[in-house]
Amino acid sequence: MGDVEKGKKVFVQKCAQCHTVENGGKHKTGPNLSGLFGRKTGQAQGFSYTDANKSKGITWQQETLRIYLENPKKYIPGTKMIFAGLKKKSERQDLIAYLKKTAAS
């Protein structure tokens, strides 16, 4: 299990430029991640996803996020997310812990 405070730092440094976790917040370049856990890929209402994201058909949970965050373009070829991924396992665990706490619907 990751560290929520460290995960917040990872989010601010590497994710917040394109994403928010604010409940009811507007989408940025990337979708609002509020309510992420339990949602299928490409399903945040009001965000324009690629066909690759819409058709992937997985449900976001701890394990799917762990794999995705390591290398987004490998996990969902055709995604428009330009982020290369988090190579450090500890950073992925921390970020997931933060998202689990803050992005819960």
Swiss-Prot record:
The keyword Ion transport does not apply. The modification N-acetylglycine is found at G2. PROSITE patterns: CYTC. Binds 1 heme c group covalently per subunit. GO terms for cellular component: mitochondrial intermembrane space. InterPro entries: Cyt_c-like_dom (IPR009056), Cyt_c-like_dom_sf (IPR036909), Cyt_c_1A/1B (IPR002327). It is found in: Mitochondrion intermembrane space. Keywords: Acetylation, Electron transport, Heme, Iron, Metal-binding, Mitochondrion, Respiratory chain, Transport. It comes from the Eukaryota. Its main location: mitochondrion. GO terms for molecular function: electron transfer activity; heme binding; metal ion binding. Electron carrier protein. The oxidized form of the cytochrome c heme group can accept an electron from the heme group of the cytochrome c1 subunit of cytochrome reductase. Cytochrome c then transfers this electron to the cytochrome oxidase complex, the final protein carrier in the mitochondrial electron-transport chain. Belongs to the cytochrome c family. PANTHER family: CYTOCHROME C (PTHR11961). This is Cytochrome c. The lineage of its organism: Eukaryota, Metazoa, Chordata, Craniata, Vertebrata.
